[in-house]
Amino acid sequence: MSQNIRAEIRARFLKVDTSNVADVLDDMGLLHQGLAADFRSFSGTSGKLAGFAYTIRGQSTPYGMGGDAEKMTACQGISEDEISVWSGDGDGTCYFGELIALGLKERGCVGALADGGVRDIAWLNQHDFPVFA
């Protein structure tokens, strides 16, 4: 699928209410497609997150000095208009913050969904980078 078509699909989803999308999916027999109630927005954006998923799977563990190179490497394949989906154990350990968001945004990423902790909320708000966790 071309990038233009992907961008058009994303734009169409951003124009409609989430509840309408959920109702249509239910009518199609695609039940339970919404986020669990545990997820909530961590940034002061419109509250909408739409795009194709780029899943990053792994364990979030504390790292030593020098940064989190493995996370940055995992992000290198993301494309424009995609959402980074951080799939892990959801134990509250920080998955996501300013440095990762900055690298993703430079690659055209439009937001993130993290099964774990998030930090640097003020930066995310200032740079209009929606994050749900």
Segments the model singles out, each with a brief description of its role:
Residues 1-133:
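Feature captures the catalytic cores and cofactor-binding loops of soluble hydro-lyases/lyases
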